[in-house]
Amino acid sequence: MRSFTRKHFVVLSLIGLGIAGVMATVHAFAQTANGAAYVIVERLTTTGPESIQQEYGKVSRDIVAKFGGRYLARSQQNTLLEGEGTVPCCMAIISFPSTEAAKNWFSSPENQDAAKIRRSGATFRIVSVQGVP
């Protein structure tokens, strides 16, 4: 009977880590591919100084990240491609791993506290859109 040496243990550990890494990647890809959600933020009117929105932006980034969110776009230069009406002056698109993560972010106490800052200087429309698998 052969005994395991330190070398065997290291090799088996590396194989185990490799399998775990592949499984984590597959799980993350499957979750994103099947359940991603995108939050579209539109600033409709500005009622206070721009510094209020800058303060909100600094606070909100960490909160979004805490819930697995990532900003895909932020812009103050938006173009109306079809339809009528005014184009929101500022827009953002945030991706989340799932609709549940987006809802948890939005309803979290941290985000609701930050929203008070946001709302003190503007009105917004915020919509969650289910991603395509």
Regions found by a protein language model. Name each.
Residues 1, 20, 36, 111-112:
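Helix-centric, low-specificity signal for extended rod-like, repetitive segments
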Residues 2-15:
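Bacterial N-terminal signal peptides that target proteins for export
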Residues 8, 101, 110-111:
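Single-residue recognition of alpha-helix capping/boundary positions
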Residues 19-103, 130-133:
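Short S/T/G/P-rich N-terminal loop/turn motif that feeds into the first structured element of a domain
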Residues 50, 108-111:
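Alpha-helix boundary/capping and short turn/kink residues
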Residues 68, 115-122:
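A short, aromatic/hydrophobic, helix- or strand-capping loop or linear motif
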Residues 103-106, 113-118:
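Short, exposed beta-strand-loop hairpins at the edges of beta-sheets
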Residues 119-133:
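C-terminal end-helix/capping segment
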